[in-house]
Amino acid sequence: MRVSSVDSLLTNNNITIDEQLVKNDDNFEKTVDMLEKFKGNLFNWYSTEDCTVLEPRFISTVDSGNFLCSLTALKEGLKEYYSECPSLAETVAKIEEIIANTDLACLYNRRRKLFHIGIYPDTCEKSKSFYDLYMSESRLTSYFAVANRIVPKNHWSSLGRIFVGGGRRCGLVSWTGTMFEYFMPCLFLPSPEGSVSYESLRFCLQNQRSRAGRKPFGISESGFYA
């Protein structure tokens, strides 16, 4: 089980409640509580059989950020149902406790003003690589960290913004040009029409379509490295 699967579960929980498909329960809280963590951060991989951490024992910065954003979306969604189910306040309080106890700052490099890719908790060795581009799946983590004053505001301006042209459009580059890097943060972050993010998304979409021709388009992580 990857921590990103937990993120999806939390987001889907909101949807199923909205659609009245299932009732909210606190099983996820109990599961998160029992999982081994490092400074509140979930490890990248857990066994689906006994929830023990799988090798390599690694904390992913972007997955931790996605987890926190998913929790935030869930708790704000649950607040809409207080009138129907007052006991949800206890669930929200527990979620807020989980968020407060998750230390993103341990993944941040103040000298570089950037987040490391991750950390190996057993040795406290941080990755030598950084999330240094704005157009990346990590911009969700960066936004959350700045908005919650976990890192300084100048981190946002430290993210690289390199423009390139292609076809009739131009936009910011990502490291591998995948749909995941460009579009994943849109699950939570708006990209207003005319903004750099909006134009970069259209730039990415145009190039993905152009490259595929008449074939299905949309290169993402799994397809890119296959």
Indicate where each model-derived feature is located.
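Ser/Thr/Asn(+Pro)-rich, low-complexity disordered segments
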Residues: M1-A226
